[in-house]
Amino acid sequence: MPCPWPAPAPPCATLREALAQGQTSGTLAARDIAPGALRSLQPRTGAAKEAAAAPGQLHALITGQPLFAGDTRLPGLLYGRVLRAPVSAEITSRPRAWDAAAARADPACVAVVQHPRLAQMGSLGLGIVARTPSALDRIEAALAVQWQVDDGSAFEQAAIDERIDIDTHLRRGALQHRLRKDDLPTDTAWTLDLRMDVPLAAHAPIEPRSATAHWLADADKKGIALKVWAGTQDLFYMRDVLARQFSLAAERIEVQACRIGGGFGGRTLCTVELEAAVLAQAVGAPVKVQWSRAQEFSQGFQRPPSSHRVRARVHGGRITHWWHALASSHILFTPAVMPVWMQTLADLAGDSGVARGAQMPYDVPQQRIEFTAQRLPVHTGPWRGLGAGPNTLVVESAMDECARHAGADPLDWRLQHTTDARLAQVLRRAAADARWPERPASDATTLRGRGIVGGIYKGVSYAAAVADVEVQRTTGQVRVTALWCAHDCGLVLQPDGVRAQTEGNLVWSLGMVLHEQLPVARSGVAAASFADYPLPRMGDVPPLHVHLIDSNEPPTGAGETAMVAGAGAIANALRDATGVRFSRLPVRSADVLQALSTRA
């Protein structure tokens, strides 16, 4: 995400240089280091890769000690909530009328707070503060807020689908941005013409976000004025936003970063932290704001939906021409981080988050890859891997279809189209671990299939996955029975941590293909609980086999790499089992039954 503040590069670089030279104590003075001298961590010869210690908070986690923002306790702590109109934050809305007397009649009510800083994009909220968290629901009901909403911005799911429909955009001509623009003959005889659509999706962290704010009396106006406890992915950004909002020097705000119960890009903006700070200032006491599950769905930002069309020509046993066009919404250049005038300028450059993963990792001589990003009335932003998950799923689905047209083995087809030794290595490793030639056989009751995918994340980290699936002929129920993943992120400093990240990516991939779709209705997100947004459960998760490639290359990151492999492997296995390429996600039992019936 673009950072509007100067990054503390010299101190970080100075510290890393000192550590690399063996200095582990004492005082360092930050010094300027030329950008050209900065480099990634270089592995030392003979480094003990498996000697990493267990995470320092492991014992505290398994014994339930207070580590998360919601665990914060302070003397005199009060509890707050900011009420908002039940529509998207992209729509202008504000409280029009409320019954303050009825709310204050509750003995647990401390205050009803109106303040312009309670605005999140177009949504202006109304704050309430109570003595106990259980009283907040009661006070909210008594307040009976009536909302003023911009009627001209009403929308339903169909409006979102129409705005990003890739075929509509292609009929209008070339898309906004091109990642690769080789000339493709207008009379190209396409072997494959594939349309795929990926829906809106939520972060759905197990821990809804929380923050506690405490304003401190400071007579000399130089010390810490505001302390905030939060589960944030960027405490410096949080501090700087609060400093701007309250016209304070950044040095007068202290943000204590607590452990996060699920971030995935969703804890980057200043939301609940600002709400807590405004309410705490209004009542002159520390205030904790804890979002509900419904607020997490409706007020957090989501992975944008995307619509894709891929055309490919297969000739002489190879792909000779490739055209991938996609339409989506913004991930980095959103209203949450920049004003409207800046969004317009940013649109000229193109949102790199939308494009991530759209460039295929294989060798095809003639390619056109283009995209457009449309402003949507739903709140979109970074989701694990940004655009890499949906984009690579589509690329690898098309790659698999091309292999079928050529009558080629999917593994051999991929190896035939790459000269990248590291990509070939993870493909071969995943295939070997899964015993690729030993394909699962279908029987009278169950269809079985196997799929493989390889990918490169941000040009530096590699992953390949193999998936096995079973499909019940009579019910259409799909079960992933095994997932293998080979992962190359250079030198692995914390093997257990990398395995855990890879396993998490694979579970997200499972949800992406078979479970997750955020419903939209009445101008906003319609999910209030996990009943409305099903996630993979423990019983849905197959055995996960992760192989970390032993490498002495510099470490390149592992938090999102396997997102380029897991979903495509599952989708390709489903295609192998059923003979049907499902073009709209998620794939549910009813979709499978209908497809099998049509095919029969």
Describe the residue ranges of each PLM region.
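Cofactor-binding beta-sheet edge motifs in enzyme active sites
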Residues: 1-600
